[in-house]
């Protein structure tokens, strides 16, 4: 009896296995999937066994950065998630935002925008770290900017208006506080006694990271740099949702002007440069509609949720006021200029070139040279005079004075504040 039952069971098991093979597909992960094609084949007397193929995709292996840095960040961060900056809670009135579930959900919705900024910020950190290690007195200013910009282009994997340099690299020296980058033929050499502001911009999908630092090679300038760095950090500390811009400016000035610096045996109070300021950043637009003053007396406008700001401060041993001086190098297409008729054919052609290559991002003459433009100065000046392109000449305090700058980009998340460009250096 036992033997007969075993034989019947074995036959039954065999029949079930055959039935399974004829009518189903056994997947690699052990799941069984009904196969209509096999059933149709069975009705026609054609029974086929089908098996799902394994995916042949290989996991990407992250590359390591080279020295000098040349590997694009997408090859290092293969999961496309880039490092988060310094995260700070808001002040007490807004501390509830940190744990509010609705605000956290809103924050998650904006991940792509934040990730673009974080990618740009990581490019900035790596580019400036390399720059600080190789820039030395005796280099030409042209070599300085080429070192920074070539590194930036490689790391951000420059791709037209999708990713690239956010604005011309500023390397303003001594009494010149901002908007100097060398034009073709500039033979200026970086000297041991120079104070150089290094202002670097990186963008990804138009999301701009704007961050700056100051380099000096003589310790007598250390207190000037310390004053400006402390003032910038105070501005970052005071910034936040509902923070009033005028109150931020007052706090910055108080810290800045508490410092003194002795240069060549003469003591100077460090002054906030009152006609320079920080600003909000819009997509593809370096200066949005809001300005963050660095002295008291600004507008009583509030910062708002979701805004992105460049908090930057400038200190000077001079008058604390800048004026336009020297040859212009920086330009940008005005976003809301509208259609303005141009009579000069060369100006029309140059405008098309600017629109295709830079959009509303700032550019400089070197960038026009780089893409093959020549004999364009008359046309460029025509675009400026027509109100289509804005020129940004160098901004200088009195000669013989020294100026310094530090700057960070911050994101006002619904939940917290992120200093996205923060690094170990500043």
From Swiss-Prot:
A divalent metal cation 1 binds at residues 199, 210, 407. Disulfide bonds: none annotated. Its EC number is 3.4.11.18. GO terms for biological process: protein processing. The keyword Cell division does not apply. It catalyses: Release of N-terminal amino acids, preferentially methionine, from peptides and arylamides. A divalent metal cation 2 binds at residues 210, 279, 312, 407. Binds 2 divalent metal cations per subunit. Has a high-affinity and a low affinity metal-binding site. The true nature of the physiological cofactor is under debate. The enzyme is active with cobalt, zinc, manganese or divalent iron ions. Most likely, methionine aminopeptidases function as mononuclear Fe(2+)-metalloproteases under physiological conditions, and the catalytically relevant metal-binding site has been assigned to the histidine-containing high-affinity site. InterPro entries: Creatinase/aminopeptidase-like, Met_Aminopeptidase_Type2, Pept_M24, Pept_M24_MAP, Pept_M24A_MAP2, Pept_M24A_MAP2_BS, WH-like_DNA-bd_sf, WH_DNA-bd_sf. Keywords: Aminopeptidase, Cytoplasm, Hydrolase, Metal-binding, Protease. Substrate binds at residues 179, 287. It comes from the Eukaryota. It is found in: Cytoplasm. Residues 47-60 have a biased composition (Basic residues). Residues 10-34 have a biased composition (Basic and acidic residues). Cotranslationally removes the N-terminal methionine from nascent proteins. The N-terminal methionine is often cleaved when the second residue in the primary sequence is small and uncharged (Met-Ala-, Cys, Gly, Pro, Ser, Thr, or Val). Belongs to the peptidase M24A family. Methionine aminopeptidase eukaryotic type 2 subfamily. This is Methionine aminopeptidase 2. The lineage of its organism: Eukaryota, Fungi, Dikarya, Ascomycota, Taphrinomycotina.
């Amino acid at each position: 009896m036992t033997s007969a039952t075993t034989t019947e069971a074995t036959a039954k098991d065999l029949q079930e296995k055959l039935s399974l093979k004829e009518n189903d597909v056994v997947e690699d992960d052990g799941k069984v999937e009904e196969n209509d094609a096999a059933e149709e084949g069975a009705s026609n007397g054609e029974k086929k066994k089908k098996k799902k193929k394994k995916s042949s995709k290989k996991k990407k292996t992250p590359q390591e950065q080279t020295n000098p840095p040349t590997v694009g960040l997408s090859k290092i961060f293969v999961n496309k998630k880039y490092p988060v900056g310094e995260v700070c809670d808001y002040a007490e009135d807004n501390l509830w935002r940190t744990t509010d579930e609705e605000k956290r959900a809103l924050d998650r919705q904006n991940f792509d925008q934040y990730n673009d900024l974080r990618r740009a910020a990581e490019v900035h950190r790596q580019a400036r770290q390399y720059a600080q290690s190789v820039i030395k007195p005796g280099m030409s200013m042209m070599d300085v900017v080429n070192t920074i910009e070539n590194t930036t282009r490689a790391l951000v994997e420059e791709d037209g208006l999708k990713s690239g340099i956010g604005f011309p690299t500023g390397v303003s020296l001594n009494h010149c506080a901002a908007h100097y980058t060398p034009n073709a033929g500039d033979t200026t050499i970086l000297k041991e006694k120079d104070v150089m502001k290094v202002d670097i911009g990186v963008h990804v999908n138009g999301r701009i990271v704007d961050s700056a630092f100051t380099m000096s090679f003589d310790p007598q300038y250390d207190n000037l740099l310390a004053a400006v760095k402390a003032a910038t950090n105070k501005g970052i500390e005071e910034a936040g949702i509902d923070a009033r811009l005028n109150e931020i400016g007052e706090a910055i000035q108080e810290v800045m002007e508490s410092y003194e610096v002795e240069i060549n045996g003469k003591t100077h109070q460090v002054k906030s440069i009152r006609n320079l300021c920080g600003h909000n950043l819009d997509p593809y637009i370096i200066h949005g509609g809001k300005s963050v003053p660095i002295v008291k007396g600004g507008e009583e406008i509030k910062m708002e949720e979701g805004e992105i700001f460049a908090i930057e401060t400038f200190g000077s041993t001079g008058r604390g006021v800048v004026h336009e001086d020297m040859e212009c190098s920086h330009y940008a297409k005005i976003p809301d200029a509208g259609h303005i008729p141009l009579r000069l054919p060369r100006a029309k052609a140059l405008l098309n070139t600017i629109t295709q290559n830079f959009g509303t991002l700032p550019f400089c003459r070197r960038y026009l040279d780089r893409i093959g433009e020549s004999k364009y100065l008359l046309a460029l000046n025509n675009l400026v005079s027509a109100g289509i392109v804005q020129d940004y000449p160098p901004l200088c305090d009195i000669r013989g004075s020294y100026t310094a700058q530090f700057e960070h980009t911050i994101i006002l998340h619904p939940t917290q504040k992120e200093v996205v460009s923060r690094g170990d250096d500043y």
